[in-house]
UniProtKB/Swiss-Prot annotation:
Keywords: Cell outer membrane, Cell wall biogenesis/degradation, Lipoprotein, Lyase, Membrane, Palmitate, Signal. This is Membrane-bound lytic murein transglycosylase C. GO terms for cellular component: cell outer membrane. A lipid is attached at C20 (S-diacylglycerol cysteine). Pfam families: Mltc_N (PF11873), SLT (PF01464). HAMAP family: MltC. PANTHER family: MEMBRANE-BOUND LYTIC MUREIN TRANSGLYCOSYLASE C, SOLUBLE LYTIC MUREIN TRANSGLYCOSYLASE-RELATED. It comes from the Bacteria.
Length: 364
């Protein structure tokens, strides 16, 4: 259990540009009535504050586990049972302060949950519905090497885990936790990536963005976790921030306001939004950069830190920055953005996405 990550409580949303940032005011939307996607964008800080207090009261201090970009965390049974999927480490840990039946139920529901996070409240204590098309199918196998795709297999696997893999640990508050650890298969990331290939192919054709770039960004942003949410309220597979990139995207779609969480938790809408934002970076904010490789490096860095921050690495004046970029070869642009960008996160981000993109170069 030492591998468990402890996530700090999010009592307020941190108001700064993170993943999928934007630098300019949005344009006015159409005067025609548009769907209202922004109803549930407020009050998240209150929700998270109450969530944190609930966990502290039941599990004790320093035991808060919270959903993040590459970690799915879901509490059930009035917060006495929880499941944690690390999509980065390829490991599932399901634990309870209640009885074995609660643990069995959580094992089954976790293994058979769907891929669409729309309408799923990760901060409530209810079970995620069982899906006929489980998201983890092909990523987890049972004791016989079978993919867990239905209730019968999941229940049989749960029985095996409870009889052979059950462990306990003691909390600082004196309570005993019972848990099981389920490893994912070695190529679990690749399996998840394949699930989204039809959508990525569709958005690539729609916006003229290379599939490998979309997939590389998805891997680095969320490890293909459709339930992803960051401390800066970036949401979904491509980690779109509603109030920045989301506003830019909606303005260009002719919508007012910004997308809400349910909109961005829909995989199709999220990949559409993230890919559209890449075109905004390419065609608007970074317009004028002539070399396609240099522009790609700038787009990747800007997706994380914002176009303004990228251009200021070269000059405070936008036109002068673009001129300087055009006077340098792509290798120099890469070196500068990975060494001179003031944000260490942005420096590392370009390295990671560029590396991840190479894996998907031959995907069509």
């Amino acid at each position: 259990m030492n591998k468990y990550k402890k996530f700090l409580p999010l009592l307020v949303l941190i108001p700064f540009l993170a993943s999928c940032g934007s630098d300019t005011p949005t344009r006015k939307g159409s005067k025609k009535p548009r769907p209202d996607y922004s109803k549930n964008t407020n009050g998240l800080d209150i929700l998270m504050g109450q969530f944190s207090r609930n966990i502290d009261q039941i599990w004790g201090v320093n035991e808060l586990l919270q959903a993040s970009q590459k970690d799915y965390v879901k509490y059930t049974d009035k917060y006495y049972t929880r499941s944690h999927i690390s999509f980065e480490d390829g490991q599932i840990i399901i634990e309870t302060l209640a009885d074995h039946n609660r643990l069995r139920n959580s094992i089954i529901h976790t293994l058979l949950m769907g891929s669409d996070a729309t309408g799923i409240d990760l901060f409530a204590s209810g079970d995620v519905p069982i899906s006929n098309n489980p998201f983890l199918a092909g990523q987890v196998v049972d004791q016989y090497g079978r993919s867990v795709t239905n209730v019968a297999v999941a229940n049989d696997f749960a029985t095996y885990l409870l009889q052979n893999k059950l462990k306990t640990r003691r909390l600082k508050n004196g309570h005993t936790v019972t848990y099981v650890t389920i490893p994912m298969i070695a190529n679990h990331v690749e399996v998840r990536a394949r699930r989204y290939l039809p959508l990525v192919r569709q958005m690539s054709k729609r916006y003229g963005i290379d599939m490998s770039l979309i997939l590389g960004i998805m891997e680095v942003e969320s490890a293909f976790n459709p339930y992803a949410v960051s401390y800066a309220n970036a949401i979904g597979l491509m980690q779109v921030v509603p109030r920045t990139a989301g506003r830019d995207i909606f303005a260009r779609k002719g919508f007012g306001g910004q997308p809400n969480r349910d909109y961005l938790y829909n995989p199709s809408q999220n990949i559409d939004a993230g890919t559209m934002f890449l075109t905004i970076l390419r065609d608007e904010y970074l317009e004028g950069i002539t070399d396609p490789t240099s522009k790609r490096y700038a787009m990747i860095s800007a997706y994380n830190s914002g176009a303004g921050a990228v251009l200021r690495v070269f000059d405070n004046d936008k036109l002068m920055a673009i001129e300087r970029i055009n006077n340098l070869d792509p290798s120099a642009i890469y070196r500068i953005l990975t060494t001179a960008h003031p944000s260490s996160q942005a420096r590392n981000y370009l390295v990671k996405v560029n590396k991840a993109q190479q894996k998907y170069r031959n995907v069509r």
